[in-house]
Curated annotation (Swiss-Prot):
May activate or repress transcription via interactions with sequence specific DNA-binding proteins. May play a role in the repression of the circadian clock gene expression. One of its GO terms (molecular function) is transcription corepressor activity. The gene is mybbp1a. InterPro entries: ARM-type_fold (IPR016024), DNA_pol_V/MYBBP1A (IPR007015). GO terms for cellular component: nucleolus. It holds the Pfam family DNA_pol_phi. Belongs to the MYBBP1A family. Keywords: Activator, Biological rhythms, Nucleus, Phosphoprotein, Repressor, Transcription, Transcription regulation. Residues 708-783, 1163-1269 are annotated as: Disordered. It comes from Danio rerio. This is Myb-binding protein 1A-like protein. Residues 731-783 have a biased composition (Acidic residues). GO terms for biological process: rhythmic process.
Length: 1269
């Protein structure tokens, strides 16, 4: 082998052959493994480095050779100066581990080796950086070996070396100082006093010059306070303490330097926090905070110094006492933080608020003192921007508050709402606000902003499940918000605690609207809140996921309703903002009576419908405070509905009678769900889930009619009208919203008045800006609008005699000034009228779009009810009536071009249909008497699927058909696969056979092969009946695609184990004979002329592979000779000897017949003629062939003509290059000849380029001829 390799490499035949190297003892392999560890230690991947270090240490532990340990130490010391950072750190960690495990290695000798290998004095300028890193990482390894404190002299040398490395700051930055701090933190007091203090004295003396040196002093002070006593500190710094007036300017400069050094890292320098701790120990915190932070750091422009102050504020919270916290949280640092938070709202600006929230969250989590927690939360709450607190109402930092602190905080919020004391807040205005405001900010607006912030904060405390609270606290918040949303105090009374807290400033309408909104948001949270408490009963309720109730089982909304009833009966002390008429008040009392009656019945015999009626009564009753008229109508319907439901139960009518109360309650739910309220939507969804078992076909039809696309026009008008009426009533109640709308309308009217009366610059600009809109609208409406407007314009001009005619020969100069003014007025009014018409059309279009959006939103809410019904009552026979309506929605939506919201709605419908209905866990099993109806539905679904044009829609119809088949078959175990339940097998087979035939013979069929494969897997009995049809179409299919799909379907059918179990041995053998015959016919004279034919052959070969394998393994009596001959003829010309899916499948089949794919013989390149010295010798003045510019653009060959390619003589020495050029020319010539058939004439641009290329070639020929001479 070696001799052959030498011959191939061109060596002489007489050269000596090396003896074969043997490694019988495995020494080479062992050494290779050992050396690989060092390669892995230097790799960038951290996990690989750590694994290599661990393996190296284990290898050395088990090794018996001392030389390997020495080599490892030398190799690791050498690697400390590696050019890559990852490699340096890897070698350093490995060296630290080595020194830690093998204590026989001397630290002294190791340090000497590091100094000797990476000598800073003898290193060149180019290598000084590597030497610096080598020394530093060597010391770092020694410090991490956990042995350094045992050898003080080595520690001293390490510290001295680190001091010398501090000069190379451009390479190491502050790493030497940090390492010295780490060494100090692990040093005992005796070693520090006896050994290190003298060495570090120079650094400690200059501690106020840099952050690193100051950090060294602060760590020494913290670790060795008995050594660095005031007397020694006096010698070092000149003062007996660090925090003094004398040292303050230098401390400020050090802090500024530290702030700038971490500008990119966004972290708090350790020296700042250590300084703060020193100030606390020296009892000089207020002086440090005032002089160093507020006066020194905050005097700078906003930037790194401010951010350091903010971080120090957040980090200091766990360290401070309550007076110190109050001092810090009411100072200038907090004010500056507030200004930064408000001015950093722009997207590209740095935002510190998330970082501060993290500091506060960590403090709240670690602090166990409720008083401190309350002080911090109040400090951030009282940081206000013109009355509006800076922190958001929804603040996750409150999640770890102590329950007692939460109680006191809620009391403070309630008191602040009633009697705001903004003078106690740390209020500020940003620079932009100061510049924009002409006068002082009104106190009432500040109070309004503060109150509108308090309500969401109270709501958040109740909503957040992580905040620990009691039911009494929740009820207190609910009562407070409800009272101030809908009532006013006439006279305080102790019976109503809410009346005892008088309002120092009356609540304006804008604030009242916010309180109402907050109440409904709170009610929504209560409706979905888990039971509060830690008792066993509470845990049982939470385990059953019962929400919206208190520990005693009563609903939260019922407690609110009781409180409201009590307030309505206390007319002497409180006044309702919503005055009720006698009829409305009677309706309220009837609600209370109905609810009490339902509660009594629920105690004796609880049922879901009782709870559903209670929720509806209470919800509609509460809504009487916002929309009494609509609520009263709903209450009457609901009352009648409940009476009929009870009457039906008492009379015990037959089950065939339709319970009308369900239909009424569904209509009420549909009416309620049209309102844009999360609370109403949630309650309606819950109530509908409870009445699902009683739902009837008529009630379900009323829900499906909403989704019916054919009834959009009728239903949308009702929904939009109801919604608009409700909105108008809300706007009548909300004066503030009215004012804003009026302002906008007045602004619009003013613009119109300016256009009509002044006709000045603004009118001209607006008319100019609307010209494009007029033209666009005119183009959309067609030419008729333009003609009408043109006629009107002609009439105006003719009426003023301003239109020149051929008869009178008049012109514009005949009009006097008065006529011209009159003409201008007429034209202005005409154009204004035209613009109003265009605007009216645009408004109408916007109105229609808005109506469509409202209808779509309403349908999405109704889909919630459909989803709830399918989830809870998937086994109900009513589900069968939902199949075709949902399919109608899907088909209509996919057949029309729709916007993104419409597509989202359609996607929701399709998801519910596919996952909740067709693939639902439960399905209808009670179909007695409905078999004929279901078979007709099956035929309709399959027939409709064949008539569609979109395969995606057909897939939903086909899935629905499979669902109907599943319902008809019922539940079947694997042992009873031959039974099909109540399916009429012949009828179903005929229907599906027609569909399969249509798929195989129709040119553009919406059906796909995947549909039938799914059918075959789920219903093996039908698969057996349809296999003959699929088998016939292997050759009878309309196109290659259908024939390939037939092969694929047959392959999946034969692979199905359930199909095998349904067939006898003789049937299976006969089937395989037919398959072989069909495959033989299909593969005769096959040609892969396009991709479709190619795919068909691939699928046919895959079927062949399965069939041949089964026939041979089971030794069936099936003749495979004809198939083998056909397969052999496919490769008669050797065209299937390449690689590819088709070729690989083909040879897999042939391998079963014992035919192995022939190996491709590599054709060796013909040896080129030997170059003579004359031809290889370069002539002077000639460029080599590799340097010559190639002309890549070849002229285009005209049709019917041939161009002679110029033959360039190349020197023999460049024969390889010449051969490559020849191959390229051949390829280009083939492409040109292929293009002759389709190319008629060259474009002018190509012709011009051809002339230029021909001229260049002529010049080259001339130049070569001259050179040759």
């Amino acid at each position: 082998m070696v001799a052959v390799m030498q011959t191939d490499m061109g060596e002489t035949e007489n050269s000596a052959v090396r003896p074969k190297v043997t490694d019988a003892k495995g020494i080479l392999k062992q050494n290779r493994q050992f050396l690989d560890y060092f390669w892995d230690i230097a790799k960038p991947d951290r996990q690989i480095r750590l694994k290599a270090i661990e393996d190296l240490i284990n290898y050395l532990k088990n090794s018996e050779q001392a030389d390997e340990l020495k080599y490892t130490l030398k190799r690791l010391v050498d690697g400390l100066s590696h050019t890559r950072e990852d490699a340096r750190s890897g070698y350093s960690v490995a060296l630290a581990q080595l020194l830690s495990v093998f204590e026989e290695i001397s630290l002294k000798s190791t340090l000497n080796s590091v100094k000797e290998k990476h000598n800073l004095l003898t290193a060149s300028k180019k290598l000084i950086r590597n030497a610096v890193f080598g020394n530093f990482f060597g010391v770092l390894a020694l410090s991490q070996s956990t042995r350094l404190h045992k050898e003080p002299q080595v520690m001293l040398e390490c510290v001295q070396l680190l001091q010398s490395l501090s000069e190379y700051r451009e390479h190491l930055r502050d790493l030497p100082r940090k390492t010295m701090v780490d060494i100090l933190s692990e040093t005992s007091q005796d070693v520090f006093e006896e050994v290190l203090f003298s060495a570090l004295q120079s650094d400690l003396t200059s501690a106020l010059k840099s952050p690193e040196q100051l950090e060294l002093l602060l760590v020494a002070l913290q670790k060795f306070p008995s050594v660095l006593k005031p007397k020694k500190l006096k010698k070092l710094l000149g003062t007996t303490a660090v925090i003094t007036k004398q040292n303050m300017p230098r401390l400020v400069e050090v802090l500024k330097t530290a702030a700038r050094s971490v500008k990119k890292e966004n972290i708090l320098p350790a020296v700042a926090l250590d300084l703060l701790q020193v100030s606390l120990r020296e009892d000089n915190f207020e002086m440090f905070w005032t002089d160093a932070i507020i006066t020194g750091m905050m005097s700078e422009m906003p930037g790194p110094t401010h951010y350091l102050s903010f971080r120090l504020l957040g980090a200091s919270l766990p360290l401070l006492s309550i007076p110190q916290l109050q001092f810090v949280l009411s100072g200038d640092v907090m004010r500056q933080y507030g200004e930064h938070t408000m001015s950093a709202q722009m997207p590209d600006r740095f935002k510190f608020a998330p970082e501060m929230a993290g500091y506060v969250g960590e403090f709240m989590q670690s602090c166990t003192d409720p008083d401190k927690q309350l002080v911090v939360v109040l400090g951030f709450t009282q940081l206000t921007n013109q009355g509006n607190p800076v922190v958001p109402s929804y603040w996750k930092a409150l999640e770890n508050m102590h329950p007692s602190a939460v109680q006191r905080y809620v009391d403070w919020l309630i008191e602040a709402f009633c009697k705001p004391q903004l003078e106690n807040c740390l209020d500020f205005s940003t620079r932009r606000q100061k510049g924009n405001q002409e006068a002082a900010v009104e106190s009432e607006s500040c109070v309004s902003r503060f109150r509108k912030w308090i309500i969401p904060r109270l709501t958040f405390i109740v909503e957040n499940q992580q905040i620990k609270k009691q039911e009494a606290l929740v009820m207190k918040v609910v009562r407070f918000i409800f009272f101030h949303a809908f009532f006013e105090v006439k006279k305080p009374t102790s019976e109503i605690p809410e009346t005892t807290q008088a309002l120092s400033v009356p609540i304006n309408q804008q604030t009242r609207t916010a309180v109402v909104s907050g109440f409904y948001s709170l009610l929504q949270a209560l409706n979905s809140m888990m039971v509060l408490g830690e008792s066993v009963e509470v845990q049982g309720l939470n385990f059953r996921r019962i929400v919206g109730v208190q520990a005693d089982g009563s609903m939260w909304i019922y407690s609110v309703f009781q409180f409201a009833s009590m307030l309505l009966n206390q007319n002497k002390y409180v006044k309702s903002l919503q005055s009720f008429s006698p009829e409305q008040r009677q309706g309220w009392d009837s609600v209370l009576e109905s609810v009490e009656a339902l509660r009594k019945k629920a105690k004796t015999a609880s049922s879901p419908e009782h709870t559903a009626f209670q929720q509806l009564f209470l919800l509609i009753g509460i809504q009487m405070f916002t929309s009494p008229e609509e609520s009263l109508d709903l209450l009457k319907d609901l009352q009648t509905c409940m009476e009929k439901a009870q009457a039906k139960k008492s009379k015990k009518k037959k089950a065939t009678d339709e319970p009308h109360w369900v239909e009424v309650i569904v209509e009420i739910l549909l009416s309620l769900v049209s309102q844009p309220s999360r609370l109403v939507r949630s309650v309606c969804k819950t109530v509908f889930g409870r009445i699902c078992p009683h739902l009837t076909q008529a009630a379900l039809s009323s829900i499906l009619n909403v989704l019916d696309p054919n009834k959009d026009e009728d239903e949308s008008g009702v929904v939009v009208t109801d919604d608009k009426k409700r909105k108008l009533k809300e706007e009548d109640e909300d004066d503030d919203d009215e004012e804003e709308d009026d302002d906008n309308d007045e602004g619009d009217d003013d613009d119109d008045d300016d256009d009509e009366e002044e006709g000045g610059e603004e009118g001209e600009e607006s008319s100019d800006s609307s010209d494009d809109e007029e033209e666009d609208e005119a183009m959309e409406e067609g030419q008729e609008v333009d003609q009408n407007f043109r006629l009107e314009l002609m009439k105006v001009l003719q009426g003023q005699n301003a239109l020149a005619t051929e008869e009178d020969g008049s012109d514009d100069e005949e009009l006097d000034d008065a006529a011209m003014m009159k003409l201008d007025g007429s034209l202005a009014s005409l154009f204004l009228e035209q613009r109003k018409k265009i605007q009216a059309k645009k408004d109408e279009k916007d109105r229609l779009n808005k109506e469509k959006g409202l209808v779509r939103d309403f349908k999405i809410k109704v889909l919630d009810m459909v989803e709830v019904f399918l989830s809870k009552q998937g086994f109900s026979p009513l589900v069968l009536g939902m199949v075709e309506p949902l399919l109608s929605v899907i088909e209509n939506g996919m057949s029309s071009e729709s916007s993104q919201p419409e597509q989202d709605y359609l996607r929701r419908v399709a998801d519910i249909f596919r996952n909740r209905l067709c693939r639902g866990k439960f399905y209808c099993k009670e179909i007695d008497g409905r078999e004929a109806e279901l078979h007709e539905m099956l035929e309709r679904l399959i027939g409709r699927a064949q008539k569609l044009t979109d395969s995606s829609v057909a897939l939903y119809y086909f899935s629905a058909a499979l669902y109907v088949l599943k319902v008809l078959r019922g539940s079947v175990v694997d042992q009873e696969l031959s039974t099909m339940g109540k399916v009429e097998v012949e009828r179903a087979t005929t229907c599906l056979k027609n569909a399969l035939t249509s798929f195989m013979t129709k040119r553009k069929s919406p059906l796909t092969g995947a549909m039938f494969i799914d059918l075959f897997h789920r219903f093996p009995v039908l698969c057996v009946n349809l296999m003959d049809t699929a088998l016939e179409n292997i050759t009878a299919g309309l196109r290659d695609h259908q024939q390939g799909q037939a092969c694929f379907i047959m392959l999946k059918a034969l692979q199905c184990k359930h199909v095998k179990n349904l067939m006898t041995g003789e049937q299976t053998t006969e089937l395989y004979k037919k398959v072989v015959d069909q495959l033989t016919k299909s593969l005769e004279n096959v040609q892969c002329k396009n991709k479709t034919a190619h795919d068909k052959v691939v699928k046919a070969l895959e079927l062949c592979l399965h069939v041949v394998k089964i026939v041979l393994n089971q030794k069936m009596r099936v003749n495979l000779e004809l198939l083998q001959d056909v397969l052999a003829s496919m490769n008669a010309e050797g065209c299937l000897e390449k690689t590819g899916k088709l070729e690989d499948t083909y040879w897999s089949v042939m391998r079963l017949f014992g035919v192995i794919k022939p190996k491709m013989e590599k054709v060796k390149k013909v040896p080129e003629a030997e170059q003579t010295e004359e031809t290889t010798k370069k002539k002077k003045g000639f460029l080599p062939e590799t340097k010559k510019r190639k002309n890549r653009k070849k002229p285009t060959i005209l049709e019917g003509k041939e161009t002679e390619t110029p033959v360039e003589k190349t020197p023999e020495g460049a024969s390889g290059e010449g051969k490559k050029n020849k191959n390229k020319k051949k390829n280009k010539k083939r492409k040109q000849q292929a293009g002759e058939e389709t190319q008629d004439q060259p474009t002018p641009k190509k012709a011009k380029m051809q002339q230029q290329q021909q001229q260049k070639q002529k010049k080259k020929k001339k130049k070569k001829g001259a050179d040759g001479e």
